[in-house]
Curated annotation (Swiss-Prot):
Name this polypeptide is given: Sodium/iodide cotransporter
Gene field: Slc5a5
Source organism (scientific name): Rattus norvegicus
Keyword Cytoplasm found: yes
Keyword set, alphabetical order: Cell membrane, Cytoplasm, Glycoprotein, Ion transport, Membrane, Metal-binding, Phosphoprotein, Sodium, Sodium transport, Symport, Transmembrane, Transmembrane helix, Transport
NCBIfam families attached to this UniProt entry: sss (TIGR00813)
Extracellular side: 1-14, 81-84, 158-163, 209-243, 302-335, 409-411, 466-520
Length: 618
């Protein structure tokens, strides 16, 4: 189909803005009502973890929403349209991530009763390692959140004329408001609403597109004829942007760095009432991720079929692949006022969920890692006040970063995954070393973090300066042959492939040799590269500088010790006796909310240490 002519610019109408405003108001109302119910938050633990009494289903949906931002709402359909349905293998990588998180990381974090994941790094290594982890997390999250807030605002502005500052300020202020007032409970329950909005938005687009294109059989047939049904791509070349191996290896490790050790996600599943419910939340999260990614990828296939003979990127109607989705919505719903506003609500629901999650998590890390160790005597009410103030500050900071994000290039999906992969990949390596390698010591993990960050940053910067050609990445061909003459305005002469401005490898004779090899690897491998470099370097330096003796490590810090203990923390109820606690298993014991300031991981005689040898199946 041709769609509108290139010179015409569709815009959102009053009904669309009304639907969008309704979504913002409902999100605000849910956040404020949940946050202020029952007297609000009485302690920092209430603010950051909901008192560790949250149910599995809302937490699971919140986990799914946290990284399914507007970046994914706009980016995944565009990538599926250009590279094919093989993007569905992302779901397999997410499944492996959920299983590894539930099996490896969740039991350790939950039984230690931590609010900040980086507390583990101090218990296992030293305060210096904890501070390094905290700072890396804050930098990564600030940059990621800035991209999440700014990129969709820019894209929608370019396609529809939606005022960029109005969208930035409305979403940023509302998100900061309910996160500051309501804390974790507000974030979780608004996420639930926003997941529903995202899914409904995708399904409405799918239904309308399939009907206009003659039914699902016709859509699949046309997609198959144009090589978009390509699930059986097992090319091992790491330079191919998306293959089975890219998602299974690179994708799994990127998602594991987000779910296994990322503060924003760990903070949610340790907020569940029991360890069993935390694992159930991960399963619910997996279902939510599958529905969102599969729906977005299928929208991408419908989008390709709709524009198969008149690619708007070739005609100049849009200037970047990320603009496909809003253009499609305006084209197929031009006679249905208000429905495009549902897509706008869908995109910004993702933005709100991610931004609120990040703000709450950054405030938690700052309180637990930077403030409480220096001011251990602060009263609970003062900590709540400080926590809310930090949420407001971080919300304002994210808006500032968003305003400075105009230099973003390479697509919003690639930009967001690059930030998380480069910085969070080495952190995943550090946590994995701590939990699996007893010999790893402080010099080793610090050296590994530095090496992993340097290598992953090196390849990311190299790929930015010398981007690979579309043939190397595996971009599938598109066409403008079916366009009317007056709609082909800005496409490059003789073009047969959609282009996002990335030069082919043969155009620049000054490109270094690494440009078409090392720098050309898929961005999904950046995190894996950082993780593996951190682990290899950390293990080597640890053995060279004197490995840590396993006997010197306290209980609950190594994954290998999980089978020999039921819990490493006391139950939440202060009235429970030691004998009552000992008969409870990990499924029944909630994470502890308070630990004496002097508790050390090796203090096995301390009343709060309940580890003992038992037979358990984990």
């Amino acid at each position: 189909m041709e769609g509108a002519e290139a010179g015409a610019r569709a815009t959102f109408g009053a009904w669309d803005y009304g639907v969008f405003a309704t979504m913002l108001l409902v999100s605000t109302g849910i956040g404020l009502w949940v946050g202020l119910a029952r007297g609000g938050q009485r302690s920092a633990d209430d603010f950051f973890t909901g008192g560790r009494q949250l149910a599995a289903v809302p937490v699971g949906l919140s986990l799914a929403a946290s990284f399914m931002s507007a970046v994914q709402v706009l980016g995944v359909p565009a990538e599926a349209a250009r590279y094919g349905l093989k993007f569905l293998w992302m779901c397999a990588g997410q499944l492996l991530n959920s299983l590894l998180t539930a099996f490896l990381f969740l039991p350790i974090f939950y039984r230690l009763g931590l609010t900040s994941t980086y507390q583990y790094l101090e218990l296992r290594f030293s305060r210096a390692v904890r501070l390094c982890g905290t700072l890396q997390y804050l930098v990564a999250t600030m940059l990621y959140t800035g991209i999440v807030i700014y990129a969709p605002a820019l894209i929608l502005n370019q396609v529809t004329g939606l005022d960029i500052w109005a969208s930035l300020l409305s979403t940023g202020i509302i998100c900061t408001l309910y996160t500051t007032v309501g804390g974790m409970k507000a974030v979780v329950w608004t996420d639930v609403f926003q997941v529903v909005v995202m899914l409904v938005g995708f399904w409405v687009i799918l239904a309308r597109g399939v009907i206009l294109l003659g039914g699902p059989r016709n859509v699949l047939s046309l997609a198959q004829n144009h090589s978009r049904i390509n699930l059986m791509d097992f090319d091992p070349d790491p330079r191919s942007r998306y293959t089975f191996w890219t998602f299974i290896v690179g994708g799994t490790l990127v998602w594991l760095s987000m779910y296994g050790v990322n503060q924003a996600q760990v903070q949610r599943y340790v907020a569940c009432h029991t360890e069993g419910k935390a694992k159930l939340a991960l399963l619910v999260n997996q279902l939510g991720l599958f529905l969102i990614v599969a729906s977005a990828a299928c929208c991408g296939i419908v989008m390709f079929v709709y524009y198969k003979d008149c690619d708007p990127l070739l005609t100049g109607r849009i200037s970047a692949p990320d603009q496909y989705m809003p253009l499609l919505v305006l084209d197929i719903f031009e006679d249905l006022p208000g429905v495009p506003g549902l897509f706008l609500a869908c995109a910004y629901s993702g933005t709100l969920s991610t931004a609120s999650t990040s703000i709450n998590a950054m405030a938690a890390v700052t309180v637990e890692d930077l403030i409480k160790p220096r001011m251990p005597g602060l009263a609970p009410r003062k900590l709540v006040f400080i926590s809310k103030g930090l949420s407001f500050i971080y919300g304002s900071a994210c808006l500032t970063v968003a305003a400075l994000s105009s230099l973003l290039g390479g697509g919003v999906l690639q930009g967001s995954f690059t930030v998380m992969g480069v910085i969070s990949g080495p952190l995943l390596g550090a946590f994995t070393l701590g939990m699996l390698l007893p010999a790893c010591n402080t010099p080793g993990v610090l050296s590994g973090l530095a090496a992993g960050l340097a290598v992953s940053l090196w390849v990311a910067v190299g790929a930015t300066l010398y981007p690979p050609g579309e043939q190397t990445m595996g971009v599938l061909p598109t066409s403008a042959a079916g366009c009317t003459n007056d709609s082909v305005l800005l496409g490059p002469p003789g073009a047969t492939n959609a282009s996002n401005g990335i030069p082919s490898s043969g155009m620049d004779t000054g490109r270094p040799a690494l440009a078409d090899t090392f720098y050309a690897i898929s961005y999904l491998y950046y995190g894996a590269l950082g993780t593996l470099t951190t682990m290899l370097c950390g293990a080597l330096i640890s053995y060279l500088t004197g490995p840590t003796k396993r006997s010197s490590l306290g209980p609950g810090l190594l994954w290998w010790d999980l089978a020999r203990q039921t819990a490493s923390v006391a139950p939440k109820e202060d009235t429970a006796t030691l004998e009552e606690s000992l008969v409870k298993g990990p499924e029944d014991i909630p994470a502890v909310t308070k630990k004496p300031p002097g508790l050390k991981p090796g203090a096995e005689t301390h009343p709060l240490y309940l580890g003992h040898d038992v037979e358990t199946n984990l």
